[in-house]
Amino acid sequence: MLFDVTLWIIKRVILDYKEIKKYNCISNDNFYISLNLSIDEIQNNEFIDKAIELLNESKLENKSNCLEIVERVGIKDLHKIVNNISRLKNAGFKIAIDDFGTEYSNLDVLEKLDADIIKVDKNFVDGLGQHLIKNETILFILRVSKKEEKSVVLEGVEDKEQDNIIKGFNSKNVFVQGYFYNKPMGKEKIKALQYSS
């Protein structure tokens, strides 16, 4: 099958989730692991069937795995994507729109795709506190997301100034991702965190 690598990654994520969830450093009940999907994968019914089958077999609780839709190329079949997102959510996956604000992503996509999480691209975070349009765009996304009961992840937070500005938004639905908190790490490094605290 064309998407065997991604399906293997989903299996691996399911196994890793079960192990990492037991670590002492993971105290949040909202803990989940994300992986990226391409537009081609989200538009492929056979791939969606297999992904749902893997999650069902795993017996994991709902929302323990998040599929991030990476929109690097234009959407070919919006109706099929909307339908497949609905199927994935009903099966228990979280859905995120990754790198929002780049390439083809736009407000129309936000309205039509029933994502749980909007991940705002690092390009917007880089301009925080310096560029009016970037600040106002993020504030707008936060307001809309709050009304729609969606979470927002601001990507690429790399310093205290950016972090302080984001904290100043005083929004309960905003989360951050970036080197200011941690670089990406493997399972063994996550495991080591439980002994360092």
Regions found by a protein language model. Give the residues of each.
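Catalytic core of bacterial c-di-GMP phosphodiesterases, primarily the EAL and HD-GYP domains
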Residues: 2-80, 156
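Charged helix-capping and loop-helix junction motifs
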Residues: 49-53, 80-83, 132-139
